[in-house]
Amino acid sequence: MTEPVIKMPKKSVKERQQQVLEVLIGLLNSEEGMQRVTTERLSKAVGVSEGALYRYFPSKTKMFEALIERIEMTLTSYINASKRQENTELAVKAILQTILEFAQKNPGVTRILTGHALMFEDELLKARVAKFFEGLELQFMNLLQMRKLREGRAFADERALAGYLVNFCEGQFLRLVRSNFGFNQHQHFEKQWQLIKPLFY
């Protein structure tokens, strides 16, 4: 299958970097998303030489790092919006739904977060993804700890529950990748939530 070619007009370095990232995520979102994205393949899709790519990013590792940072910022904004629910239980449910819907709609992102898109890349990227999940766990933990102030009730172990919620997300990401995104997470979430809900009582 021929990769789509995008002609790049004269733009600032920052604009070109954003365009490279958009093409990269587009390749990861495609049916060939499980294939390794080489700089040759990426440069063809962008419509520039391999050498030109390195004018925008010093290495492919830096491209993926920028992409992971972008994913992190996007999800953080969604999570912050979900925290506005009236109580902790509803906030956690909204966050889980938001994260899983995002994963379903963005196969390339999910392949990065499960490590499948990074199998042949620098080990530093796997450490960066691990840091992403540590940050997610911290956000859950902070939200759970706020319950005592907001509702006058505390959990027995906020850290353990936060870790469980992150593990749940990771498991669903892997299930999506394993099914090649044929698994409909939205259809099954309410039943799964009924198993998580008792942890809030």
From Swiss-Prot:
Gene Ontology MF terms: sequence-specific DNA binding
Per UniProt, the keywords (alphabetical) are: Cell cycle, Cell division, Cytoplasm, DNA-binding
Which InterPro entries has this protein been placed in? DNA-bd_HTH_TetR-type_CS (IPR023772), Homeodomain-like_sf (IPR009057), HTH-type_Tx_Regulator (IPR050624), HTH_TetR (IPR001647), NO_SlmA (IPR023769), SlmA-like_C (IPR054580)
| PROSITE patterns in the record | HTH_TETR_1, HTH_TETR_2
Write out the GO biological process terms.
cell division; negative regulation of division septum assembly
Annotated HTH tetR-type domain ranges read 14-75
According to the entry, DNA is bound by residues in: 38-57
Q: Which Pfam families match?
A: SlmA-like_C, TetR_N
Superkingdom is: Bacteria
Answer whether the UniProt record assigns the keyword Cytoplasm to this protein: yes
Instruction: Please describe what this protein does.
Output: Required for nucleoid occlusion (NO) phenomenon, which prevents Z-ring formation and cell division over the nucleoid. Acts as a DNA-associated cell division inhibitor that binds simultaneously chromosomal DNA and FtsZ, and disrupts the assembly of FtsZ polymers. SlmA-DNA-binding sequences (SBS) are dispersed on non-Ter regions of the chromosome, preventing FtsZ polymerization at these regions.
Q: Which family does it belong to?
A: Belongs to the nucleoid occlusion factor SlmA family.
Quaternary data: Homodimer. Interacts with FtsZ.
Cited NCBIfam families? PRK09480.1
Which protein is depicted?
Answer: Nucleoid occlusion factor SlmA
- Which species is the source of this protein? Glaesserella parasuis serovar 5 (strain SH0165)
